[in-house]
């Protein structure tokens, strides 16, 4: 029995579909993405320390592409206690950490107002980034059990969100954003940013 079916018997492993194949075809179904996630190795906390560049992992979720259109750069894990969960690129090209509480209202509106998921809104967001920026960390790292496996998880300080990670390779993790009340998980990829 695969790790995917052990973690959740209702998710069937998809023969031949790997993380690499899903990225190459540009999308996966929710069940395919969950099977891929479940088949990956857990992540130790110290593995996550450092800067990471983010990218999408398309599954048909309303948030697919939103972060990229808003010039999301990734995440920065300074220590287990100090994490910057939302790092964006300003118009100047410099990176800035955003206060998660200030961005949350827009997430709930995406289903009702899909026009918010547009390049224009992303450009406007980039111009107002200085108003949303903060220097303090807004999350921490903990090991949690998710889908039956203990793995590194980024827990937001003031929001009901956990980002759970599984290891693709020494430089890449697949993440799931687990937001209380969200009907389906949101997937994303982080790659080490050694600049």
Language-model segments: residues:
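Soluble ligand-binding/transfer domains with enclosed cavities or grooves
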Residues: 4-195
């Amino acid at each position: 029995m695969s790790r995917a079916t052990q973690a959740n018997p209702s998710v069937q492993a998809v023969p031949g579909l790997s993380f690499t194949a899903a990225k190459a075809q540009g999308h996966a179904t929710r069940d395919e993405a969950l099977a891929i996630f479940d088949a990956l190795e857990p992540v130790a906390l110290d593995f996550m320390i450092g800067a990471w560049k983010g990218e999408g992992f398309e599954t048909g979720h309303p948030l697919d592409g939103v972060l990229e259109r808003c010039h999301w750069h990734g995440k920065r894990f300074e220590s287990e206690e100090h994490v910057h969960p939302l790092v964006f690129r300003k118009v100047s090209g410099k990176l800035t950490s955003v206060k998660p509480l200030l961005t949350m209202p827009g997430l709930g509106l995406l289903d009702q107002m899909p026009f918010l998921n547009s390049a224009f809104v992303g450009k406007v967001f980039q111009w107002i980034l200085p108003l949303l920026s903060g220097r303090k960390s807004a999350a921490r790292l903990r090991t949690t059990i998710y889908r039956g496996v203990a793995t590194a998880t980024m827990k937001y300080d003031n929001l009901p969100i956990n980002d759970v990670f599984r290891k693709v390779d020494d430089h890449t993790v697949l993440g799931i954003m687990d937001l209380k009340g969200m009907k389906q998980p949101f997937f994303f990829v982080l790659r080490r940013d050694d600049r």
